Regions:
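Alpha-helical transmembrane segments
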Residues: 14-28, 73-79, 120-121
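Cytosolic juxtamembrane helix and N-cap/initiation of the first transmembrane helix
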Residues: 2-22, 38-49, 232
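Terminal signal-anchor or tail-anchor transmembrane helices
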Residues: 26, 120-128, 138-150
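Hydrophobic, membrane-inserted alpha-helices
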Residues: 53-57, 74-83, 97-101, 118-126
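Canonical alpha-helical transmembrane segments
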Residues: 51-67, 100-106
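Membrane-helix interface and helix-disruption motif detector
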Residues: 31-47, 62-69, 81-95, 108-112, ...
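Cytoplasmic-side transmembrane-helix entry/capping segments in multi-pass membrane proteins
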Residues: 67-75, 113-118
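C-terminal catalytic/motor cores of large multi-domain enzyme assemblies
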Residues: 5-6, 31-32, 70, 85, ...
Length: 444
């Protein structure tokens, strides 16, 4: 059965009535238990966790109900388990577990939402029967939210259980592909190094033409990025990543990361640029999007990423180590806030480094174990090579590339096809002026 994606709008009055009920549930819990609870378990199950569940339910529905309404199942589980513990009856445990599984199934879009009302009504009736006002108000809040729940009909992908903010879980991957991440949990232990060169006579001619057309700053970097974007349009599995031993796809969001210097000096600070590109982008669109980010980075005295790092470094060492550990745990479960993902150099589709301006050959840059970046592409200075053509010695110019690839996102044959297509685009860059005829989808 096709999964439905449910959502609520904060403009719906029932959403705010639900929030009012949840707030009343918290107040009632605090009033009802005064002087009646003496054990630690009683405090946690009678006050702390039910109040947390009520607040969390309301916050998820109001702040993230448009895309992540399914996460309201988490506070429902917390509330139901606390309710069952306080009751101590086997029949209540069975009823609560059935209710939790049913709610999770429905709110995740696996069943029609019309069944949500009788489930909530059953819980509400049970609460009234046991004369539990805080629990009754919590159940009433769930009932009030029901009329506001709608089904997404735009045909687009919306996250559900197992998905991340920055990626959709690839549930159709082969079994061997899925289990590989458990045997090779780190990127540094699952990377493949690859070096290749491309003859750039046509590419340099193309760059000169683009500059004459008005893209005055068009460079090798823009051409390489445009070719990579077009490659993802044909080979979408290149835009996958591994996180928490699961395979995810970024879909049509190509997050390109690059480090730039504000000035070409050894003492100049580095700034991270992250530009979001689309598989249908042309070379001109890549040029404009990338240059906007470069301009922002160079004009700002201190970027958001710089300020965040400075804040972390102000923390004592042991506390900082704990903060990093906590961040890794959040990343494992896909719970890192979106604003942190946006400024993180460790999260993206690909990391480019152009060392040509430094006059050196491209390096084999390591992958990051933390984060999601599965591909590191470096290119360096142009080089000349003498070759024999038709019995004569001719001089050609080449650009060298190095790739560091996470082998867990796709197999070797797929990677070989990707590299060949990428180099072919750079040999015939004029195709980058027009959008691709078709954009392949990684997940149908």
């Amino acid at each position: 059965m096709k999964r439905e994606h449910l959502y609520v709008s904060r403009r719906h009055p029932c959403v705010w009535l639900m929030a009012l009920c949840m707030a009343a549930s918290v107040v009632a819990a605090l009033i009802a238990v005064q002087g009646t609870i003496s054990t630690g378990l009683g405090i946690w199950c009678g006050i702390v966790l039910p109040c947390v569940a009520a607040i969390l339910f309301a916050l998820i529905a109001i702040c993230a109900g448009g895309e992540m309404l399914y996460r309201t199942a988490v506070p429902v589980w917390i509330w139901s388990i606390c309710f069952a513990i306080q009751s101590g009856k086997v029949i209540v445990w069975i009823a609560c577990l059935l209710f939790c599984f049913g709610y999770t199934h429905i709110i995740g879009g696996k069943a029609k939402k019309v069944w949500l009302l009788p489930l909530c009504a059953a819980a509400f009736g049970g609460c009234l029967y046991l004369h539990s006002l805080p629990d009754a108000l919590f159940a009433a809040g769930m009932i009030l939210l029901w009329p506001a729940i709608k089904v997404h009909t735009d045909g687009k992908w919306h996250p559900t259980w197992g998905d991340r903010i920055d990626g959709r879980r690839v549930r159709t991957a082969q079994v061997m592909e899925q289990i590989t991440a458990y045997f090779m949990p780190n990127r540094t232990g699952a990377n493949n190094l690859f070096a290749e060169s491309v003859e750039i006579t046509e590419l340099e001619r193309y760059i000169r033409r683009k500059r004459k057309e008005g893209l005055t700053g068009f460079s090798m970097t823009h051409a390489v990025m445009a070719a990579y974007v077009r490659t993802v349009a044909k080979y979408p599995a290149l835009n996958r990543f591994i996180a928490g031993q699961r395979i995810y796809s970024r879909g049509e969001d190509i997050a390109v990361c690059m480090t730039v210097k504000k000035e070409l000096t050894a003492q100049a600070p580095d700034s991270l640029i992250k530009v979001h590109l689309h598989p249908s982008d042309t070379a001109a669109q890549v040029y404009r999007k990338f240059n906007e980010k470069v301009k922002e980075a160079k004009n700002e005295m201190e970027t958001t990423a710089d300020a965040m790092v400075a804040g972390f470094m102000a923390i004592p060492r042991l506390a900082l180590k704990f903060a990093v550990w906590l961040l890794k745990c959040l990343d494992y479960f896909g719970l890192v806030p979106k604003f942190l993902l946006e400024i993180s150099p460790f999260h993206g589709s690909v990391y480019f480094t152009n060392v040509g301006s430094l006059g050196i050959k491209p390096v084999f840059h390591h992958l990051y174990d933390f984060g999601t970046v599965p591909v590191f592409c470096a290119f360096g200075r142009k080089r000349r090579a003498e070759e024999i053509k038709d019995g004569e010695i001719v001089e050609r110019k080449y650009l060298d590339f190095t790739f560091n690839l996470d082998e867990r996102i796709c197999d070797g044959f797929y990677y070989a096809s990707v590299i060949k297509y990428f180099l072919r685009l750079l040999s015939h860059p004029e195709v980058l002026d027009n959008p691709p005829e078709t954009v392949e989808s990684d997940i149908p």
